[in-house]
Amino acid sequence: MSIIEGKVWGTTIPLIQRPQIELHSIFVNAGGYCSKHCHQSKINAFYVEDGELEIHRWKDYDLVDVTVLYAEDVAIVPAGEYHMFKARRDTKALEVYWSELSLNDIERDVVGGMSQEYDL
């Protein structure tokens, strides 16, 4: 069972909530917008299923980009960047948060092989 969270701008349904990834289904009413905010360590992506969603992005105090997303469009906002969204019309979207993992996050003590080469 999903918990629907009411927002001033619409609703959000958390589908997956884990330490390094979150997935939310959001519905934003026409004219609705979220707070201007940033995430310290989360990267934020928006995928519009239906509707039109503006993604506003700032660098310091300067608005540097407004991207309009339509059905099947995606926008990614890096961690630490102020942003907000606003719906031009009723919009259904997926919002994904994740944190970067190191691709080289492995320390090998023994290299893999066949069992006759190494006695476990």
Language-model features: where?
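Catalytic phosphate/metal-binding cores of nucleic-acid and nucleotide-processing enzymes, i.e., regions
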Residues: 21-23, 80-84, 88
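A generic "binding-loop/recognition-motif" signal
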Residues: 32, 41-42, 81, 89-90, ...
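A short, N-terminal "cap"/entry segment at the start of jelly-roll beta-barrel domains
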Residues: 1-25, 30-36, 66-71, 111-120
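Glycine- and acidic-residue-biased ligand/ion/polar-headgroup-sensing regions
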Residues: 41-60
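Short acidic-glycine-tyrosine-enriched beta hairpin
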Residues: 59-80
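Double-stranded beta-helix
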Residues: 3-6, 86-120
